[in-house]
Amino acid sequence: MNSTSEGNPTPPSFPRLCYAAAHVVMNDDYRAVDHSVESPGSPDEIARYINWDATMAFRRHLDGHGFGIAEAMDTAQRFSLGWVNAKRLIRSCGNLELSERFVAGAGVDHMNSIHSAGDLIEGVIYQARIIQESGGIPIVLPMEWLPQHGAHEQTYIDVYASIIDALDGPLFLHWLGESFMPSLAGYFPGDSFFRIMAHDPSKIRGAKLSLLDDAFEWTARARLASDDQ
């Protein structure tokens, strides 16, 4: 591997950038805490045991191997960490001066309650702007409130369009299937996903699809490629 003048490894060049959803590194004494994958503890409890230096060093390690960093992104771990810890991860990642701009999930987990689609829009914009101010690219996380309230296709389009219009690009969308989160069953009803992706292709540069549906993902890749997404 080549090295820079400072002695740091030069990331290899690849035709595509692969993003690694890096997890956090915990201090050894977390082993003694009563926890499991399903019940890792409250965000405040978890924060006491995060080894922040090792967590950031892991991101530098991945960057050195040519990976982009998807920060505060792995859905299950993100929501276990809570927004306060996620925000610290995002800002700390932004201070690493990585080879590639990192991406990070923008959602509404900082809000105690959501009463309307307008609350959703404001919440996502708030987090997305923090990500952008930190030097990252927002990935709009799926919004559980929409399927929980039986939102129709046009509501999805209106919510996402309002978020997209309020932000600078580039942006990405995340579509998480019900296999990973049953409460998201029926997400993006009708043709809403493709209509949203077509709203402003110059801003919406792509999507992360976690659907376990290879046929649909092939179809989506072909359709989006026509808009250089």
Predicted regions and their residues:
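Active-site beta->alpha loop and helix N-cap motifs at the rims of alpha/beta catalytic domains
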Residues: S13-F188
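Catalytic alpha/beta core domains of metabolic enzymes, predominantly
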Residues: D168-Q229
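Residue-level detector of functional hotspots within protein domains
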Residues: S3-S5, F193
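Polar/charged low-complexity regulatory segments
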Residues: S3, T10-P12
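Charged, compositionally biased N-terminal leader segments and the immediate start
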Residues: S5-E6, V25
